[in-house]
Amino acid sequence: ASSLVGSEMCIRDRFEATDARGAFPCFDEPQFKIEWQVTMSVPVGDVALTNTPPEETTAKGGFETTRFMRTKPMPSYLIALAVGPFDFVPVEDTSTPCRIVTPKDKAWMAKDAAENTPPILAALEDYFGRPYPYRKLDLIAVPEFNPGAMENVGLITYRETILLLDPETATVAQKRTLSAVNAHEIAHQWYGNLVTMEWWDDLWLNESFASWMGDKITQQVFPEFGMDITTVRGNEGAKNSDTSAAVHAIRAPVMSNAVFESMDATITYSKGQAVLEMFENFVGEELFREGVRNYINQNEWGSAVAADLLENLSESSGVDFHTAMGTFLDQPGVPDVSVTPLGDGKVELAQSRFQFLDQDLQQEMPWQVPVVLKYSDGSQVREHRVMLTEPSEVIELPGGADPEWIHPNSNETGYYRWDVGPEKLLEMVAVAQETFTPRERVAMVEQVSAQMRAGRITGGDYLEATTVLLNDEHPEVVNTALGNLGEVRMAFVTAELMPAFRAWVRQSVGPLVERYGLTPQEGEDESVSLVRPSLIAWMGNWGADPEVRAFASEVTEAYLADRQSVDGSIAGPCLRIAAIEGDWRLYNTFKKEYEAASVPAERQRFLSALGRFQDWSMQEAALDFTLSGELRPQ
């Protein structure tokens, strides 16, 4: 992938999986890890960067030639080259030299990245029990960069929109994304770089682990961002993708670059992450970490396959990971665990492959499901762990008495759907807020939707349950319910039903707007600022609420006059709502502001709003602009 800004800057990276051979001769496969030495000649005044620090620089004929230090053993796809008039922001308190690298005159937007990198790096070094393995760590913001980021050894590339934030207007959502992506990419320096998968069928050894570790470290270092809630939402998204008839397994044969490019990221990243979290929770954090450390230490600077990791985890935990985790790695699909109380403390657990109505998906083999039941015996809430290895098993809960209730997936750390029957499910929804954790309630939103799509509850039951969950006290439960309703709206709400749907939105979402307010309040919880944009969008767009639309117009005028006068979290939804009833004057203003904006988030806001004008001639103009070649990728 190349990135060009005028004639000033060039980035050549993202060689994964087979593009390095187009840049230089090499054995372009991940198993070939060698030491590389890069030499670059660039015009005087430009700066050359690669994976290692410079070793020697000479000047001749208007060019500077820099020979860089030899790398540690690494595969070809992790090489990166950058040339340009960069600005540098030093990052303090790190174990290795570290900088944020920006395009010229954009260093002022690197403050958040420079501040959150040291604690992330320190937490990762602590987890692995060993220091960062390379000579330097440069984090570079790349304009016109298609991937979110790329974990090149010592020179990690990021989209500008992720790495560069306006310190005065950056939102909680932006800061959370920066932290999570940063933790993911730095985690790759161990997972994927220090130890590399031998072939692309084990890409999960890179991406599943970096996703799991990135979210884990973000939650540890920045608990205010509620990354554990974001994680469970990602897990639920993976379950939805994993219910497709055409889905592949986490480990799948990769015979060509076309197959590699077509792999479903929600499986390789999110499902793999969820499976790792499930097994870590089942065997315990310390035993799991011991296995991970042994895997890294035994395979450092080399390549590995899944069996290497599974053997280390088996040895540290005493659990047969080859068999148990193998049932999740090597077949597609989501286990569906049904829980049926039999009396006298006995419970029947049964497993099958979860599927939606009218699907006929086959299960290749029984899963070995690490089930963690959560139940109340009347005096206290208990957990009971069981490895479900058969199609059905009868277990006995400690104590021998029938529980008041059973949650089949304690804290939703397991990668499986569950079924307690429609009546019990609706009873659980009714008492969810006072009984279950925020993670469990967020997942319950998705559980209710999945049960409807499987034909186990009616559409009326779904709306009744969703209305209850919409009134949850935790903003992230509300946000999840709104997102889920968006999918239902697209599937079921026709033009004829739209007036009734708008009335339902105003009735159901309106009280939430009153609860949280349209404008941010000083000292409010971060989760409130995450849900407010969704509430504004729903009321202004699908609710067509006149008060919210008037508010959005006022905010838009204020934002156009002074960016600092409007909280960044509400600017985007207000611009989009204002566009719904906007005229050509507003359309041209948004287009002009988009073209002039230097802050990545501002460009995104105006560009998104350009697509929301309802007049057909404006929609046609927006489409023409998109296809004209004038539109930058970011």
Question: Can you name each region flagged by the protein language model?
Answer:
Residues A1-G6, I11:
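Single conserved hydrophobic/aromatic residue that forms the stacking wall/gate
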Residues R12-A20, P25-A183, S211-D215, H248, ...:
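Hydrophobic helix-coil surface modules that form long, contiguous segments used
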Residues F32, L361-V369:
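Short coil-to-beta strand junction motifs in C2/discoidin
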Residues S7-E8, T50-G61, D377-P391:
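Solvent-exposed beta-strand/loop surfaces of large extracellular or lumenal domains
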Residues V38, V369-K374:
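Short polybasic amphipathic segments
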Residues F68, T94-D360, T480, E487, ...:
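Hydrophobic alpha-helical and helix-loop surface patches within well-folded domains
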Residues N235-G237, T243, E348-A350, Q359-L361, ...:
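Long, ordered, helix-rich scaffold segments
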Residues V42-V44, R353-Q355, L373-D377:
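Beta-strand elements of well-folded, non-transmembrane domains
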